[in-house]
Amino acid sequence: DVLKLFSNEYKNLYYTYVPVDTQYLSHKKLALTMGIKAARHDILLFTEADCRPIGPKWIKAMAGSYNPETDIILGFCAYRHTKGFLHKLIAYDNLTNGLQMISSALSHHPFTGNGRNLSYRKKLFFAHKGYARSLNLHAGADDLFINEVSNPANTQVQLSSDSIFKMNKVEDS
């Protein structure tokens, strides 16, 4: 009822429901699929709540990398510098994974992406039936999908300083 009331006032607010029989599916992939379906434009841009762009022109940098043949833009997300062995280990793992993703794509062998800084076309998502192959897996919304759909012709890397993100530190438990 509240959403209906708000949607009358805010014309850009959309809502839907999640059927009960989706309990064994990845909720993140289901939410992303619903958001992608509702998107009005073809170019989609993704990040995560614990990440922030370094500069103010992230959207312009990522969107500016598209040409007619490009369907995927891979961006980098660094781990925020913090003290402690755990954080250094996380930063190292993040850096090596990011370098592997970027170097593979730059050498015309793209195989993965990172949802913290990623863009792809809506039409690509639906042409490949979205997350259909991995909907029952709780991980892989970014890396498994990009592995399925990327190729040397449709994938670009954006590494300008405006396109780089930083991920906040993981909180110690």
Where in the sequence are the language-model features?
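Active-site acidic short loop of glycosyltransferases
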Residues: 10, 39-42, 55, 67-68, ...
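Short aromatic/hydrophobic "clamp" motif used to bind/position activated sugar donors
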Residues: 32, 44
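Catalytic donor/gating beta->alpha subdomain of glycosyltransferases that bind UDP-sugars
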Residues: 66, 72-96, 123-126, 130-173
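Acidic donor-binding segment of Leloir-type glycosyltransferases
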Residues: 1-22
